[in-house]
């Protein structure tokens, strides 16, 4: 008989009366009145093994096994006795009567029980091998595998070709810092790990491969958050001779296919499309969570002449904004709740949080409860009540500051209230999946510190055709042929139509204050390629880690990556990064300089 004939979790009634050989790990060992029960686990699940004392040698071995011992058992599949069926297990109607038990490898006492749900992330990542044995982690990584498989199936059916691009490449400015790799044979020179395959996939379009994809690692040396890793995985795609709408349709279908085939979720037949300007005006975010049934109300124009300088000053500022967030039934929020929200918005730069409770709307000013009402004239109060559509029992929160602070703080408050217990109880958040496309992004953002424009996405995104003239006269007015796919408040994919003409690409570089010499030095290979009849092309990249995190309902991207880094970009399992030998540094012509100590 083979070492293993079946997976533990797949032993069911169809094997009744058969002898099987199973391999796995001891989940738990129980001694019940002279009979030993072993819950044997492998990647497919659990099966109950019964060790009877009639087989003395086998029973003696069973007495010695402990949690996480790796064992092989041979035995007879039989029905469980009446009253002992476990409906929670696929194998819960049967058990295996053990005839032979072999310890393949003993285990030291594990540092934690695999069914402990209260482990710190540090403990889990330090002992990642054991953590990966947990059923939830097994589920997450197998889900990740299925998502990748279904993406490949779809793209293959659509005529895409999987082509690998280099991991050692040229350092080019794309927003985040590069991970640099020193070259031993080219002293003093460095490769960079790719932040994306962006330029190579464009070159593949010029090279007539028409449709390209790869599921690939990308690297960015940036500050980490719950949804970021220094190395992450993209489903990276590019296609020729398709317009923006056709590209969106193609990849919208891909995401629908993946969700249906992996978790049996039917996404909307057509994803709504929202311009960037509308998303910012209504939600303060370019990745709005449409499950939350709360929206901003614009009040900037109505607050220009009020005596309340907290409102009037930003209302009259060039980059200022005053906006409101009406919360239905929010009048029941306590002062403690409001104080908590006030402290919360300070995280996002807000100086405070003004509010008005609407007790009796019909009474106008007299029906409102708020410390700020006395500072507002009747016309402004009327505008607030009319524009927000406030009703008795509502509360209205206000943000007034630079537009970015208003958008960030009030947008975060919108999500916090919507997803709170109060929000759930009052229907302020819907269940399910709410996808959309956000389009028409600004082409450039102005960097006050450097006094120049920077690319909002990357410098290879095409401006909208009608905005080409602004590249040289007013770059701030340019909108891009860029699009992000957003799902439940997460950007899961982003892409654009690319620049395919050399003269347009050069104009964009000039708008970014990248001179001809610098452009040739950094991007000469691209500019040269664009001169050889480059086709119109565009593409998109999806964050595989993010998609799987959402599907799995995981708290963090780290829960869907086998060996992730911490928020300090450290691998607690292998203790990377770590110092290297002085000889290695000499071979690379590198001398370390100690970081400067902060002054006392």
Swiss-Prot record:
L-aspartate binds at residues 174, 220, 457, 498. Its EC number is 6.1.1.23. PROSITE patterns: AA_TRNA_LIGASE_II. The record marks 32, 83 as: Important for tRNA non-discrimination. One of its GO terms (biological process) is aspartyl-tRNA aminoacylation. InterPro entries: Aa-tRNA-synt_II, aa-tRNA-synth_II, aa-tRNA-synth_II/BPL/LPL, Asp-tRNA-ligase_1, Asp-tRNA-ligase_1_N, Asp/Asn-tRNA-synth_IIb, AspRS_core, GAD-like_sf. It is found in: Cytoplasm. It comes from the Bacteria. The keyword Ligase applies. Gene3D superfamilies: Bira Bifunctional Protein, Domain 2, GAD-like domain, Nucleic acid-binding proteins. Residues 198-201 are annotated as: Aspartate. ATP binds at residues 220-222, 229, 491, 543-546. GO terms for molecular function: aspartate-tRNA ligase activity; aspartate-tRNA(Asn) ligase activity; ATP binding; nucleic acid binding. It catalyses: tRNA(Asx) + L-aspartate + ATP = L-aspartyl-tRNA(Asx) + AMP + diphosphate. One of its GO terms (cellular component) is cytoplasm. Keywords: Aminoacyl-tRNA synthetase, ATP-binding, Cytoplasm, Ligase, Nucleotide-binding, Protein biosynthesis. Homodimer. Belongs to the class-II aminoacyl-tRNA synthetase family. Type 1 subfamily. Aspartyl-tRNA synthetase with relaxed tRNA specificity since it is able to aspartylate not only its cognate tRNA(Asp) but also tRNA(Asn). Reaction proceeds in two steps: L-aspartate is first activated by ATP to form Asp-AMP and then transferred to the acceptor end of tRNA(Asp/Asn). This is Aspartate--tRNA(Asp/Asn) ligase. The gene is aspS.
């Amino acid at each position: 008989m083979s070492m293993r004939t079946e997976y533990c979790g797949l032993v069911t009634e169809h094997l009744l009366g058969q002898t099987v050989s199973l391999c796995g790990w001891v989940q738990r060992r129980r001694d019940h009145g002279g009979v030993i029960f072993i819950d044997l686990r492998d990647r497919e699940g659990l099966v109950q093994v019964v060790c009877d004392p009639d087989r003395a040698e086998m029973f003696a071995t069973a007495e010695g096994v402990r949690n996480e011992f790796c064992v092989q058992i041979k035995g007879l599949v039989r029905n469980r006795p009446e009253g002992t069926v476990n409906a929670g297990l696929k194998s819960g109607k049967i058990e295996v009567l053990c005839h032979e038990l072999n310890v393949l490898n003993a285990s030291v006492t594990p540092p934690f029980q695999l069914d402990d749900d209260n482990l710190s992330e540090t403990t889990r990542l330090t002992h990642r091998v054991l953590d990966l044995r947990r059923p939830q982690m097994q589920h997450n990584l197998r889900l990740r595998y299925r998502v990748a498989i279904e993406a490949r199936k779809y793209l293959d059916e659509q005529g895409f070709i999987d082509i690998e691009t280099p991991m050692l490449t040229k350092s080019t400015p794309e927003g985040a810092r590069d991970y640099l790799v020193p070259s031993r044979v080219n002293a003093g020179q460095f490769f960079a790990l790719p932040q994306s395959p962006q330029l190579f996939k464009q070159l593949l379009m010029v090279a007539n491969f028409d449709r390209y994809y790869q599921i690939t690692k990308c690297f960015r040396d940036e500050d980490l958050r719950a949804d970021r890793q220094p190395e992450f995985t993209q489903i990276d795609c590019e296609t020729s001779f398709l317009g923006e709408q056709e590209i969106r349709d193609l990849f919208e279908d891909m995401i629908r296919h993946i969700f249906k085939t992996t978790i049996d979720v039917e996404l909307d037949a057509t994803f709504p499309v929202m311009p960037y300007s509308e998303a910012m005006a209504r939600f303060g975010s370019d990745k709005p969570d449409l499950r939350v049934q709360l929206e901003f109300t614009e009040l900037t124009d109505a607050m220009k002449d009020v005596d309340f300088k907290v409102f009037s000053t930003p209302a009259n500022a060039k980059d200022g904004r005053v906006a409101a967030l009406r919360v239905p039934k929010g009048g029941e929020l306590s002062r403690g709740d409001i104080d908590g929200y006030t402290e919360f918005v300070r995280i996002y730069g807000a100086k405070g949080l003004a509010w008005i409770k609407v007790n009796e709307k019909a009474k106008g000013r007299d029906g409102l409860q708020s410390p700020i009402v006395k500072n507002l004239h009747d016309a402004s109060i009327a505008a607030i009540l009319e524009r927000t559509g406030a009703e008795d029992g509502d509360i209205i929160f206000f943000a007034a500051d630079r537009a970015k602070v208003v958008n960030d703080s009030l947008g975060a408050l919108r999500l916090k209230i919507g997803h709170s217990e109060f929000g759930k109880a009052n229907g302020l958040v819907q269940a399910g999946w709410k996808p959309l496309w956000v389009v028409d992004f600004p082409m450039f953002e102005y960097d006050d510190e450097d006094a120049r424009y920077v690319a909002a996405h990357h410098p290879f995104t095409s401006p909208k055709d009608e905005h080409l003239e602004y590249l040289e006269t007013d770059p701030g007015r340019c909108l891009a042929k860029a699009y992000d796919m957003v799902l439940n408040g997460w950007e899961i994919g982003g892409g654009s139509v690319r620049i395919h003409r050399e003269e347009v690409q050069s104009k964009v570089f000039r708008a970014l204050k990248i001179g001809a010499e610098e452009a040739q030095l950094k991007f000469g290979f691209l500019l040269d390629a664009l001169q050889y009849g480059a086709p119109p092309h565009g593409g998109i990249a999806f964050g595989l880690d993010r998609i799987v995190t959402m599907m799995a309902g995981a708290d963090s991207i780290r829960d869907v990556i086998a060996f992730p880094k911490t928020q300090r970009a450290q691998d607690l399992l292998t203790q990377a990064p770590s110092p290297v030998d002085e000889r290695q540094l000499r071979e690379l012509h590198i001398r370390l300089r100690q970081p400067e100590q902060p002054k006392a």
